[in-house]
């Protein structure tokens, strides 16, 4: 599409300890994560550093997407002040219809292109929810930040400070999250 765009893929868990390093220099962040805690971490980073990002999620037959433009639109914490508690649908518990993923990914990718080419007047300023099975589409106004918002209003970036919920739920049966093994200084690699 554009030879001037530089994409730097990273294989790493996004944590409060490495978020600044992994996301530094980004012009836009596209969410492809499977849990709210990581999304709140992205949101806190984006608010702190004035980086636009696009929240996108799908489960079952529906998906949602939200453009977050710090200082201009509502952020994720404006719309969802707290992580859901109790039972939360996941890909493992509810499955996922690939057409829901395709639709939300297409909308999010198109919004990213609009951001990158400077077509601000064409950007959607709503939380879009779309259920492809029920043929139901809904939008929630997200055109303005909330002054009482923890993140963008009060600048209380608890997830970036490592004060959010510690656990992460992954999609899929028997999913695991492998963390780098730390060795004492001076110890040689195991054969």
Feature map (PLM): residue ranges:
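Adenine nucleotide-associated cytosolic modules
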Residues: 1-191
């Amino acid at each position: 599409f554009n030879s001037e765009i530089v994409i730097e893929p990273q294989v790493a868990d996004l944590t409060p300890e490495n978020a600044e390093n992994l996301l530094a220099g980004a012009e836009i962040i596209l969410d492809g994560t499977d849990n709210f805690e990581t999304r709140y971490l992205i949101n806190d980073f984006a608010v702190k550093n004035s980086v636009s990002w696009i929240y996108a999620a799908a489960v079952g037959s529906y998906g949602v997407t939200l453009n977050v433009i710090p200082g201009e639109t509502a952020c994720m914490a404006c719309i969802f002040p707290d992580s859901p508690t109790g039972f939360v649908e996941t890909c493992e518990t509810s499955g996922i219809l690939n057409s829901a993923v395709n639709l939300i990914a297409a909308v999010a990718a198109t919004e990213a292109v609009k951001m990158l080419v400077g077509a601000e007047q064409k950007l959607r300023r709503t939380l879009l929810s779309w259920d492809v099975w029920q043929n139901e589409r809904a939008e929630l106004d997200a055109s303005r930040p909330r002054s009482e918002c923890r993140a963008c209003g009060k600048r209380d970036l608890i997830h970036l400070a490592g004060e959010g919920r510690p656990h992460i739920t992954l999609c899929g049966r028997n999913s695991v999250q492998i963390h780098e093994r730390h060795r004492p200084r001076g110890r040689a690699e195991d054969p």
